[in-house]
C-alpha cells in the first residue's frame, strides 16, 4: 500500500490475520482480539494465523476488512474518506467479489471514489509496455495474462493454482527428508525465508542434480532463530523446479512455461509475435535467480524457431503491480 506517484510502496506486510489462541493468559498486556501483518508475524507463537486471500481471491471478508483497516489507519495513517482508492484484483476474479469489495469500500470506509484494476495489467505498465504477456506468480496463484494495447484478453487468460505457498510447502517436505522437522505455521514462515534467501532455478535440472550429487560446494547454511544451523544443497533448486514441473508435487498441471505458451496460442495469430517479444515476469515467485534464463530456454524450445523471444523480469518485480498502480493513478486522465 502507498500513495500514487511514489516510486515504492510505503507499507509492505503479509496479508495475515492472527487471533490469540488463548484469551487472557497475559494479564495487563492490553491484548487485542486480532493482529495484522508483521505484528501477527512476530507474535505468531501465541496466535492462530489465517490467510483471508486464497489462490488470489478473497474468501474471508471479515479478516480482509481488518487488513484494510490496518492499512489505512496504522500503516498509511490516512482517512479513507478523504482520498480516492485504487484496488487491484486477480484476473478472472468473480464479479460477486468485485461487488463485495466495492461495497466494503463505500459503506465501511466511506471512500469518495474507487477503481479496481487487474494486477497483471499494472505489472505490464510498470515495465513500460502496453502490449505483452505477463506471468504473474505470487503466494497463492499464478496467472498468464496476454495484454494488447492495455487491454487484457480474457479468453486467453490461464490460471494455475501453484505459487509461493506450494513451493514453501514442498521445501518443508524435502527438508524433512534431510531430517529437519518443520510443521507449524510459525515454522512455515522460517522455511519461506529459507526459500527467499537461498533458492534458485537451475538452467538444466537433471545436469544440476548430477553436479550437486557429490559436491559439498553446492551447500549453503542457514541459521534458525534458535541458533541451530540448517544445511541445504540440491533442495535450493529442487524447490522452484516445481514451477516448471508441477508433477513433482503430484499436480497434473503443466509448468509455467507451457501455461504461458498455451496462453499465447489462444490469442489471435497476428499479435503473437508481439507477445513472444514481451514476456514479463511479475510477483514474488518470479524473483528466483536464474528464472529468466530458464524461462527463455524453455520458451524457445516451444515457440516457432524464427520467433524472437524476450523474457524480462523487472528488478522490483515483487512490487511491480503496486508500481503500475502508482503510475496509473497519477495520470491526469485517470483522476477524472
UniProtKB/Swiss-Prot annotation:
GO cellular component: actin cytoskeleton; cytoplasm
Listed SMART domains: ACTIN
Entry-linked Gene3D superfamilies: 3.30.420.40, Actin, Chain A, domain 4
Localization (cell): Cytoplasm, Cytoskeleton
EC number in record: 3.6.4.-
Enzyme class: hydrolase
Record keywords, A-Z: ATP-binding, Cytoplasm, Cytoskeleton, Hydrolase, Nucleotide-binding
Pfam families, per database record: Actin
GO MF terms held by the record: ATP binding; hydrolase activity
Catalytic activity entry: ATP + H2O = ADP + phosphate + H(+)
Annotated transmembrane regions: none
Described function: Actins are highly conserved proteins that are involved in various types of cell motility and are ubiquitously expressed in all eukaryotic cells. Essential component of cell cytoskeleton; plays an important role in cytoplasmic streaming, cell shape determination, cell division, organelle movement and extension growth.
Further remark: There are at least 5 different actin genes in tomato.
Membership in a protein family: Belongs to the actin family.
The protein's name: Actin-105
Organism this protein belongs to: Solanum lycopersicum (Tomato)
